[in-house]
């Protein structure tokens, strides 16, 4: 299992939001590249970049910042936030993204995965973000609730050729209260593709629980920014060192 630090970008700055609310920030740092480099020095083997402006407003304010990070860091970078079309995904892959994270677009129209595969994009480069609230998948920056469970959507996405799922439990995201293991376990048990877990991961114990149920990776955000968790130590613990 790999521990992936999140670098969320809003208006060219690195931020951490509370439950995805653009008006509720509890961290704001001026230089996202420096933040990414700091996490790599701690042993991060991948960086999880999210373009919040693109996700929330559909703007490309952060394009140059993202490009600079991808070009500057020595580890793979996965990028999400506002990847709405095949063209958006291809542009990020052209910038050098190791994986693109599709959200609402793939949940509403799983054919986007087929189209990317037809363009010659390897399925390992296609990750789909499944965000759940009260047991149902939510879309459009967590603003709109669907009638479907993560497993129902996850199976469709897997069938279409998604390479991995990024699962975020919105109920616990950014609250620093720890994880709810059950919904993650259900997804791991029901799907065959790798599951990356996100949302509420606060303690080393959370990491070990996720490792135990077979999660392939975890994205950590608030806990490392608020220094409740030491990234270097977290990576060592997960590796069993």
Swiss-Prot record:
GO molecular function: 1-(5-phosphoribosyl)-5-[(5-phosphoribosylamino)methylideneamino]imidazole-4-carboxamide isomerase activity
Keywords: Amino-acid biosynthesis, Cytoplasm, Histidine biosynthesis, Isomerase
Enzyme class of the recorded protein, top EC level: isomerase
InterPro entries documented for this protein: Aldolase_TIM (IPR013785), His_biosynth (IPR006062), HisA_bact_arch (IPR006063), Isoase_HisA-like (IPR044524), Isoase_HisA-like_bact (IPR023016), RibuloseP-bd_barrel (IPR011060)
Compartments where found: Cytoplasm
Active site: 8 (proton acceptor), 131 (proton donor)
Pathway: Amino-acid biosynthesis; L-histidine biosynthesis; L-histidine from 5-phospho-alpha-D-ribose 1-diphosphate: step 4/9
Record's protein name: 1-(5-phosphoribosyl)-5-[(5-phosphoribosylamino)methylideneamino] imidazole-4-carboxamide isomerase
Annotated organism of origin: Methanococcus aeolicus (strain ATCC BAA-1280 / DSM 17508 / OCM 812 / Nankai-3)
């Amino acid at each position: 299992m790999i521990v992936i630090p999140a670098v969320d970008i809003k208006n060219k700055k690195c931020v951490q939001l509370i439950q995805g609310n653009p008006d509720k920030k509890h961290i704001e740092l001026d230089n996202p590249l420096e933040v990414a480099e700091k996490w790599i020095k701690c042993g991060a083997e991948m960086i999880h970049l999210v373009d919040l402006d693109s996700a929330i407003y559909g703007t490309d304010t952060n394009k140059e910042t993202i490009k600079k990070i991808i070009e500057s860091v020595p580890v793979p970078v996965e990028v999400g936030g506002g990847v709405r079309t095949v063209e958006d995904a291809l542009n990020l892959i052209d910038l050098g993204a190791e994986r693109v994270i599709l959200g609402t677009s793939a949940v509403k129209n799983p054919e986007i995965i087929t189209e990317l595969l037809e363009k010659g994009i390897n399925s390992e480069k296609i990750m789909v973000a499944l965000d759940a609230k009260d047991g149902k998948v939510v879309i459009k920056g967590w603003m709109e609730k669907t009638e479907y469970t993560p497993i129902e959507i996850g199976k469709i996405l897997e069938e279409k050729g998604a390479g991995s799922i990024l699962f975020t439990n919105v109920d616990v995201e950014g609250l620093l209260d720890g994880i709810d293991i059950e919904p993650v376990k259900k997804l791991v048990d029901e799907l065959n593709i790798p599951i990356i877990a996100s949302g509420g991961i606060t303690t080393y114990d959370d990491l070990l629980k996720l490792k135990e149920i077979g999660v392939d990776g975890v994205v950590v955000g608030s806990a490392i920014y608020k220094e409740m968790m030491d990234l270097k130590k977290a990576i060592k613990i997960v590796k069993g060192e």
